[in-house]
Amino acid sequence: MGLETEKTDVQLFMDDDSYSHHSGLEYADPEKFADSGQDRDPHQLNSHLKLGFEDVIAEPVTTHSFDKVWICSHALFEISKYVMYKFLTVFLAIPLAFLAGILFATLSCLHIWIIMPFVKTCLMVLPSVQTIWKSVTDAIVAPLCTSIGRSFSSVSLQLSQD
């Protein structure tokens, strides 16, 4: 039971221009379909999603299924993951991208035209408020606390034992 431990990468390249209905099958140029070096996740936002079959399903050394079962389940896992991702992105990617665009545009508009002017206005008014607050504190709160402190400082306790 020779278990294959190497991962293989299989790619299918199809080119509508290279396939002629009259002259037979011609092979597509793989360089035409090769990724142009463009990383779709340059900031590694979804690095946690890079899972393989061994990360999800693992058999300990003491319990192994038949090699053919392991190989077939590995193939079905990879195919179903690939097909379901493509299927879901066909139906969900465009509507969700549209909704995310609307959400981010709304939040950007609110931030630019409402939140930041409000914050800047508050920061402009704060020195005046700080001066008024200091005057109120000096005129009302400080004398009140001083008088309460003097009242409590004259209190004395005497303990007697009967």
UniProtKB/Swiss-Prot annotation:
GO terms for cellular component: acrosomal membrane; caveola; caveolar macromolecular signaling complex; focal adhesion; Golgi membrane; nucleus; perinuclear region of cytoplasm; plasma membrane raft. Phosphorylated on serine and tyrosine residues. CAV1 promotes phosphorylation on Ser-23 which then targets the complex to the plasma membrane, lipid rafts and caveolae. Phosphorylation on Ser-36 appears to modulate mitosis in endothelial cells. Phosphorylation on both Tyr-19 and Tyr-27 is required for insulin-induced 'Ser-727' phosphorylation of STAT3 and its activation. Phosphorylation on Tyr-19 is required for insulin-induced phosphorylation of MAPK1 and DNA binding of STAT3. Tyrosine phosphorylation is induced by both EGF and insulin (By. similarity). The modification Phosphotyrosine is found at Y19, Y27. The modification Phosphoserine is found at S20, S23, S36. Keywords: Cell membrane, Cytoplasm, Golgi apparatus, Membrane, Nucleus, Phosphoprotein. Its main location: nucleus. Monomer or homodimer. Interacts with CAV1; the interaction forms a stable heterooligomeric complex that is required for targeting to lipid rafts and for caveolae formation. Tyrosine phosphorylated forms do not form heterooligomers with the Tyr-19-phosphorylated form existing as a monomer or dimer, and the Tyr-27-form as a monomer only. Interacts (tyrosine phosphorylated form) with the SH2 domain-containing proteins, RASA1, NCK1 and SRC. Interacts (tyrosine phosphorylated form) with INSR, the interaction (Tyr-27-phosphorylated form) is increased on insulin stimulation. May act as a scaffolding protein within caveolar membranes. Interacts directly with G-protein alpha subunits and can functionally regulate their activity. Acts as an accessory protein in conjunction with CAV1 in targeting to lipid rafts and driving caveolae formation. The Ser-36 phosphorylated form has a role in modulating mitosis in endothelial cells. Positive regulator of cellular mitogenesis of the MAPK signaling pathway. Required for the insulin-stimulated nuclear translocation and activation of MAPK1 and STAT3, and the subsequent regulation of cell cycle progression. This is Caveolin-2. It comes from Aotus nancymaae. The gene is CAV2.
